[in-house]
């Protein structure tokens, strides 16, 4: 059984989802993976609805798990950039597969479900 810190997991899939799961982490990973290094404000603008505090927390957790790298530059005003680590980049094929699965699911299931509701079924 895998363990992360003090937490035990039933399997590696559960551990993976605990690291990248949540409303905002995958979106942040997606932008960093597809668009490259971003400053905090750029990431926040790409994620409408996220609060500054939530983005800070999500990025810190990803940094703690060595998925995201945070680079602080000694300039005024402060400049901080975020990028994927090598370990973080290994998640991109998984995120790509999840994206494709979601597109297919929406196209086949949700569209059919909406049509059935319109037809009274």
Give the residues covered by each predicted segment:
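Residues within the DNA-recognition helix of helix-turn-helix
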Residues: 58
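Long, low-complexity, charged/polar intrinsically disordered regions in eukaryotic proteins
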Residues: 1-4
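Basic, amphipathic "hinge/linker" alpha-helix immediately C-terminal to the N-terminal HTH DNA-binding motif
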Residues: 74-98
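Short beta-strand "wing" residues that participate in macromolecule-binding interfaces
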Residues: 69-70
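Glycine-centered, phosphate/nucleic-acid-interacting loop/turn motifs that mediate DNA/RNA or nucleotide
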Residues: 66
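Amphipathic alpha-helical dimerization/coiled-coil segments
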Residues: 31, 89-121
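DNA major-groove recognition helices of helix-turn-helix
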Residues: 62
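N-terminal helix-turn-helix DNA-binding core of bacterial DNA-binding proteins
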Residues: 7-54, 81
